[in-house]
Amino acid sequence: MLKFALIGLGVMGKNHYRALQNVAGVQIAALCDPFCKENFAHKIYANLDEMLESENLDAAVIATPTSLHKEAALKCMQKGLNLLIEKPVCANAADAQILLEEAKRRDIKVAVGHVERFNPAIAALKKELENEEIYSVQITRNAPFPQRITDVGILADLAVHDIDLIRFLSGKEIK
């Protein structure tokens, strides 16, 4: 049984909380959010360092505001935890590079929450495009500005989905 911690209990953190409860072989061992006012069925820590010292964990989901991802991830890596980090992975490329190097150095698995790849409509489109040559891609987003992304802005928060989908559907890297 993998013991998971969930760090950040905002909109995305609550989504991960619900999802993790239904994953076989996963046990939610602890939650961490200094501003959480809600009741959960699991222990909630207000301090990440205290949680990491007190709990015997295997992995963590980081669903804090993006500006806090790097610090939380580095602390978790020091404890040897594998990570799922909500996107965008960091506020800038330099911080993401630091996390990548630390994960490699410690042999830690890190995944970024690119969930759109698993959308049934995207899976159907990927299958449809399987033997086709893609010449041009145009993506349009029609949705209101979500308040939860004010720390990094709409391009950094939502465009990462679009860029990931272009890579996924085309099977090519963007240079």
What is each model feature region?
Residues M1-A41:
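N-terminal Rossmann-like dinucleotide-binding module
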Residues C90-I149:
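A contiguous active-site-proximal alpha/beta segment in oxidoreductase catalytic domains
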Residues V23, S54-E55, N119:
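Acidic-histidine catalytic/liganding microenvironments
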Residues P146-K175:
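Rossmann-like dinucleotide-binding domain that binds NAD(P)(H)
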Residues A29, H42, D58, Y135:
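Conserved acidic residues
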Residues H16, K43-E102:
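Beta-loop-alpha module in the N-terminal Rossmann-like domain of NAD(P)-dependent dehydrogenases
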